[in-house]
Amino acid sequence: MLFFVDTANIDEIREANELGILAGVTTNPSLVAKEANVSFHDRLREITDVVKGSVSAEVISLKAEEMIEEGKELAKIAPNITVKIPMTSDGLKAVRALTDLGIKTNVTLIFNANQALLAARAGATYVSPFLGRLDDIGHNGLDLISEVKQIFDIHGLDTQIIAASIRHPQHVTEAALRGAHIGTMPLKVIHALTKHPLTDKGIEQFLADWNK
């Protein structure tokens, strides 16, 4: 499973990139809105200068024709831009049109397997099932990863699964075990993955022994 960082903060992206494991970035309007004094397109240019893997940039429009035009403009920013499209009927139309133009797409806000299958059939490069938000309403978001992976394997679909709305390290482990191709997560979760109390204890013991 590959690691994406879910942020529009350029300092966090640089920090994640320095770890040597970063394969891409996902952004959304809420994350971009937190970034003051920079335009959306300028921030995307900054991000694509740092990260050479996929950078998902979400459209704001909700009508198919407007999403298509917005997606084409976003794709001009850099060759590694992936246009992020919400899972709606108009979104599917936009995905098909952009795919036919050779533009990569990431269908977001996936909450059931039927939505993922529709997105894949429309030509989506990626689908993003949301784990944490399903957990919030009493569902098991990880079961959705398993369902989507099984359906895609049965039908030979190449669309990749991005496990999104990851809240903690256990989400990462389980998403990887269930076959997600990518996990996108906040920087704090990436850092949490590096930690274990026995690792810290072992380092302390090694240093204590060395300094005897």
Curated annotation (Swiss-Prot):
Q: Does the keyword Cytoplasm apply?
A: yes
Disulfide pairs?
A: none
GO CC term (a single one): cytoplasm
Q: Which GO molecular function terms does the record list?
A: aldehyde-lyase activity; identical protein binding; transaldolase activity
- Which EC class does it fall in? transferase
Q: What PROSITE patterns does the record point to?
A: TRANSALDOLASE_1, TRANSALDOLASE_2
Which modifications occur after translation, per UniProt?
Answer: Phosphorylated during sporulation.
One GO BP annotation here? pentose-phosphate shunt
Statement: the UniProt record of this protein carries the keyword Calcium: no
Can you tell me which residues form the catalytic site? Answer: K84 (schiff-base intermediate with substrate)
Provide the protein's localization.
Answer: Cytoplasm
Q: Which residues carry this modification: Phosphoserine?
A: S39
What are the record keywords, sorted? Answer: Cytoplasm, Pentose shunt, Phosphoprotein, Schiff base, Transferase
Among InterPro entries, the record links this protein to: Aldolase_TIM, TAL/FSA, Transaldolase_3B, Transaldolase_3B/F6P_aldolase, Transaldolase_AS, TSA/FSA_arc/bac
Membrane-spanning residues where? none
Q: In which pathway does it act?
A: Carbohydrate degradation; pentose phosphate pathway; D-glyceraldehyde 3-phosphate and beta-D-fructose 6-phosphate from D-ribose 5-phosphate and D-xylulose 5-phosphate (non-oxidative stage): step 2/3
- Matching Pfam families: TAL_FSA (PF00923)
EC number, UniProt record:
2.2.1.2
Q: Which reaction does it catalyse?
A: D-sedoheptulose 7-phosphate + D-glyceraldehyde 3-phosphate = D-erythrose 4-phosphate + beta-D-fructose 6-phosphate
Which PANTHER family does the annotation name?
Answer: TRANSALDOLASE (PTHR10683:SF36)
What the protein does comes down to:
Transaldolase is important for the balance of metabolites in the pentose-phosphate pathway. Does not show fructose-6-P aldolase activity.
The family this protein is said to belong to: Belongs to the transaldolase family. Type 3B subfamily.
What name has this protein been given in UniProt?
Answer: Transaldolase
